[in-house]
Amino acid sequence: MRYFFQPKADSPLAKIFIIILIAVIGVLGYLVFNWEKPTNNVEGDIELGNVNASAGSDQKFNYLVSQTSNNCGLQRQVVFNYSDNQRIQGSCCDKMDHHAYQEQIEGLRKYKDISIIPTDPYDISAGQAKQLFKYFEEIKLTSDQQATYNEAMKMSDEGGPCCCKCWHWDAYEGLAKKLIVDYGWNSEQIAQLWDFSDACGGTGHEHAA
């Protein structure tokens, strides 16, 4: 005696049952393998990285923190071979820190009317870097101007434009020369700009005044 309905294996009803069963298994398999997995963001639940996001934003940080085109071994001679649109992104040494990055960008906003100052030290075009290299190579400081530069080196967190003698050092030395000669900047102004423009990564940073 049968206690439940059991169609014959070769009956049309059995074939329909098998087709439905296969379809259900297929749907379940699709859901299992395509289930949306959480994304591991750098800062917990903040938004995903976006190359086009504004400087200092969570999205821009999450993009830049994984970029490696900026590094200690990169020299200006190499950057001169880049196309002007190519970008040098990320930190050269330590991992970028979210809070320090935002503090730096906030500090740099005070210079927004000086177009030669990069707005984001962790994302600079090769074209802008080449312009700063030009200042580095062509501007000769007087003895008084050199004294201002040397004093700025003593005052800055990194002991100069960067933590290492790389493309960034040369670029920001050139920028400092330009600002001293054509804008009359003093050593304190140069040192603070360098601190805001640090691209070495890590937690050290300068607070905006």
Feature map (PLM): residue ranges:
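Second-shell loop/turn segments in exported
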Residues: F133-I139, M155-K165, L175-D182
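A cross-kingdom marker for long, charged
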Residues: M155, K178-V181, W185-A209
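Metallocofactor- and cofactor-centric catalytic cores in central/energy metabolism, strongly enriched
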Residues: I124, F136-G160, I190
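Hydrophobic membrane-insertion alpha-helices, especially the h-region
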Residues: F17-Y30
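Long, acidic, intrinsically disordered low-complexity segments
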Residues: S83-F136
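Ser/Thr/Pro/Gly-rich low-complexity linker/stalk segments immediately outside membranes or between
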Residues: N34-G56
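Short, thiol/selenol-centered motifs that function as redox-active sites or metal-ligating centers
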Residues: S69, G90-M96, G159-Y172, G204-H205
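N-terminal Lys/Arg-rich, disordered targeting/topogenic segments
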Residues: M1-P12
